[in-house]
Amino acid sequence: MTVQVGQPAPNVPVQAYDRTKDGKDDQFRQIGLEDYKGKWVCLFFYPRDFTFVCPTEIVSFNDNLDEFEDRDCVVLTASTDSEYTHKGWCDSHEDLQKMRYPMLADTAHKLSEAFGVYDPEKGLAYRGVYLIDPNGIVRWIAVHDLGVGRNVDEVIRVLDALQTDKLCPCNWKPGEETLN
């Protein structure tokens, strides 16, 4: 069964490539969502390393990482590539050399299957993004087609709305009135 809004996020530990110290120090380690209990988590899946749309999203999340951190939210990304492929891609792509959040390696497809974005025919994950609250509950899901990149500003807007814990109308923005 795939995860739905209001359900606990599956904790499926996987290997990761973590290049978080000024883009210079790299390490391989295992990461699971349980590691981030007590924090908001933005987990986004992308189809494949060494492609065209994917780096635009990864770079945009990286460029906006301070916005997420200001909201006590960690960013994680995942694809079905290995942690070594992630490292090779980051090493060879100028913009990815500045990565400040971990890249999860879902080589067994268990994480993307648990979140309902794995396509077994193509062997990759759709562009799913999940906001998970500090209690480990999935609060928001968006899944895009393979060729359509996400809007990071919209992810941040939804995170802001969820953190108000109030009713937020259509097109609500931070600073505007809520409905309660």
Residue ranges and their predicted role:
Residues 1-180:
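Chalcogenol-based redox active-site neighborhoods
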